[in-house]
From Swiss-Prot:
SUPFAM superfamilies: Class II aaRS ABD-related, Class II aaRS and biotin synthetases, YbaK/ProRS associated domain. PANTHER family: MITOCHONDRIAL RIBOSOME PROTEIN L39/PROLYL-TRNA LIGASE FAMILY MEMBER, PROLINE--TRNA LIGASE. It comes from Bacillus subtilis (strain 168). GO terms for biological process: prolyl-tRNA aminoacylation. Catalyzes the attachment of proline to tRNA(Pro) in a two-step reaction: proline is first activated by ATP to form Pro-AMP and then transferred to the acceptor end of tRNA(Pro). As ProRS can inadvertently accommodate and process non-cognate amino acids such as alanine and cysteine, to avoid such errors it has two additional distinct editing activities against alanine. One activity is designated as 'pretransfer' editing and involves the tRNA(Pro)-independent hydrolysis of activated Ala-AMP. It is found in: Cytoplasm. Its EC number is 6.1.1.15. It comes from the Bacteria. The keyword Protein biosynthesis applies. This is Proline--tRNA ligase. Belongs to the class-II aminoacyl-tRNA synthetase family. ProS type 1 subfamily. GO terms for molecular function: aminoacyl-tRNA deacylase activity; ATP binding; catalytic activity, acting on a protein; proline-tRNA ligase activity; transferase activity. Keywords: Aminoacyl-tRNA synthetase, ATP-binding, Cytoplasm, Ligase, Nucleotide-binding, Protein biosynthesis.
Length: 564
């Protein structure tokens, strides 16, 4: 492609509202342009990268017998109502009405559509297993779109769905998809770590996220420094090691703590450690209230609370709800004397606490010498806190460390979450109707583009891996007015294209400095510069990844490039 005939609007200045390096560089290099908040146009270079990522996806999907199709982005409300998610998905689901007042959603995901489709078309176990996938734009009304393509309101996604007659079949496809995803990201050149994750609004149980390691990642990964264990911090189990105390329980004592509401204030006022305090947090779980206790130096993990209670929605109680339910303000809440309408759940570390400090459910007062087994009615002890750096790894090997990551893919075992709700059944060998077992597998294609840019750049610009680069080669003719340079550049352009290379040819009437700067910014794997030695048949070849430059005869150019 001649650069004079395409659209690559590079920028010299960093856009003021671009936080992430990938966002800055994709804008500066002319890959994307913002239409509105969280919505972008993919310029010619970006779209070629997207197509290369999609081709890798298609090749890996074909290897595991997944079949491509395309479903509608506009989805009727009735289908979502069947699954129940119309009422629980939240404001991220973009809803609209047609001229007749009928309700629709713009597809944030396609479980409902694919389940209803397969329900109507597949009736026998003989047609299972079946894996279908699509690559399509998705829509989510993000509260705060940011980081360019990493968190947008419209994005390109590959989503696959598998249907099975047995758990063994689902497990087999899940493992194949897991390996295919690992291959996809490796081929795209991304440093990705698969981690144990939460299924969230998707439902189901077993799930893994593929996290591209990045300092600007919005997810925290907890990993072992001595093993392969890795999990999203929301799902990382805490390996509880109870240490018996030889301290004798003391009598409960109420103390005056004027305006002392936080753990930090409490430890300073009473001269105790955070480990000796009980943090009590009131949650609303669907239509009931529960009190959750953790040690003062720990934080409540609301995902673990949600999973323990099998709740659809778990939210912190409001200031008014705390007063209404417990008769006191936040900051003085505790487990002693809670009425039976509010169930109390405690983290496993609380069970071993002796003579702890906790709120007295009375303004400006706390209790000392709280022993929950004696003084409170605990419904259940469980792992309810976030893991911390320095905790032992849940697999018993090594210590937990943290890293930041960008989620670029996720695989789920949905089980019968959707098939039972939507009556998607098949007839088994005995002619009995059974709910289909389902798997769901997603890759953020546009997010993957951004993650590659986030991991592959330097101070001069982008550095695209060869597998996804928009072009293989970048030819620069430094002086288009010089007949020798122009003619040699034209010949190389034609010859290298004929050899099967994707070539971007900078034939613009620009200064050499502009061409070099744009070339580094765009970041194609190999640059061929036709300059002052063109009459000698000598060109400069620069490898973008290493920065190494070599002057070489055009007769040896093809052989040299093929080895890179």
């Amino acid at each position: 492609m001649r650069q004079s005939l395409t659209l690559i609007p590079t920028l010299r200045e960093v856009p003021a509202d671009a936080e992430a390096k990938s966002h800055q560089l994709l804008l500066r290099a002319g890959f994307i342009r913002q239409n509105t908040s969280g919505v972008y146009s993919y310029m010619p270079l970006a779209y070629k990268v997207i197509q290369n990522i999609q081709q890798i996806v298609r090749e890996e999907m074909e290897k595991i017998d997944a079949v491509e199709m395309l479903m509608p982005a506009l989805q009727q409300a009735e289908t979502w109502q069947e699954s129940g998610r119309w009422y629980t998905y939240g404001p991220e689901l973009m809803r609209l009405k047609d001229r007749h007042g009928r309700e629709f959603a713009l597809g944030a995901t396609h479980e409902e559509v694919i389940t209803s489709l397969v329900r109507d078309e597949v009736k026998s176990y003989k047609r299972l297993p079946l894996t279908l996938y699509q690559i399509q734009s998705k829509f989510r009304d993000e509260k705060r779109p940011r980081f360019g393509l990493l968190r947008g309101r419209e994005f390109i996604m590959k989503d696959a769905y598998s249907f099975h007659a047995s758990a063994e079949s689902l497990d087999e496809t899940y493992q194949k998809m897991y390996e295919a995803y690992s291959n996809i990201f490796a081929r795209c050149g991304i440093n990705v770590r698969p981690v144990i994750a939460d299924s969230g609004a998707m439902g189901g149980k077993d799930t893994h996220e593929f996290m591209a390691l990045s300092a600007i990642g919005e997810d925290t990964i907890a990993y072992s420094d001595e093993s392969q264990y890795a999990a999203n911090i929301e799902m990382a189990e805490v390996l509880h090691q109870e240490v018996p105390s030889d301290e004798e329980p003391k009598a409960l004592e109420k103390v005056h703590t004027p305006n002392v509401k936080t753990i930090e204030e409490l430890t300073a006022f009473l001269q105790v450690s955070a480990e000796a305090c009980i943090k009590s947090v009131l949650f609303k779980a669907d239509d009931r209230f529960v009190l959750v206790l953790v040690r003062g130096d720990h934080e409540v993990n609301d995902i673990k609370v949600k999973n323990l209670l099998h709740a659809e929605v778990v939210e912190l109680a409001t200031h008014e709800e705390v007063i209404q339910q417990l008769g006191t303000e936040p900051g003085f809440v505790g487990p002693v004397g809670i009425h039976q309408d509010v169930e109390v759940y405690a983290d496993q570390a609380v069970k071993a606490m002796v003579n702890a400090v906790a709120g007295a459910n009375e303004g400006d007062h706390h209790y000392k010498n709280v022993n929950v087994n004696r003084d409170a009615q605990i419904k259940e002890f469980a792992d309810l806190r976030f893991i911390k750096e320095g905790d032992p790894s849940p697999d018993g090997k090594g210590t937990i460390r943290f890293a930041e990551g960008i989620e670029v893919g996720q695989v789920f075992k949905l089980g019968t979450r959707y098939s039972e709700a939507m009556n998607a059944t098949y007839l088994d060998e005995n002619g009995r109707a059974q709910p289909m077992l389902m798997g769901c597998y997603g890759i953020g294609v546009s997010r993957t583009l951004s993650a590659i840019a986030e991991q592959h750049h330097d101070e001069k610009g982008l550095i695209w891996p060869k597998s996804v680069a928009p072009y293989d080669l970048h030819i620069l003719a430094l002086n288009m007015k010089n007949d020798g340079q122009r003619e040699l550049a034209e010949k190389l352009y034609a010859d290298l294209k004929a050899e099967g290379y994707e070539v971007l040819y900078d034939d613009r009437a620009e200064r050499a400095g502009v061409k070099f700067a744009d070339s580094d910014l765009i970041g194609l794997p190999i640059r061929i510069t036709v300059g002052k030695r063109a009459d000698e048949g000598i060109v400069e070849v620069k490898i973008r990844q290493t920065g190494e430059s070599t002057e070489i005869s055009v007769d040896e150019l093809s052989a040299f490039i093929s080895k890179q």
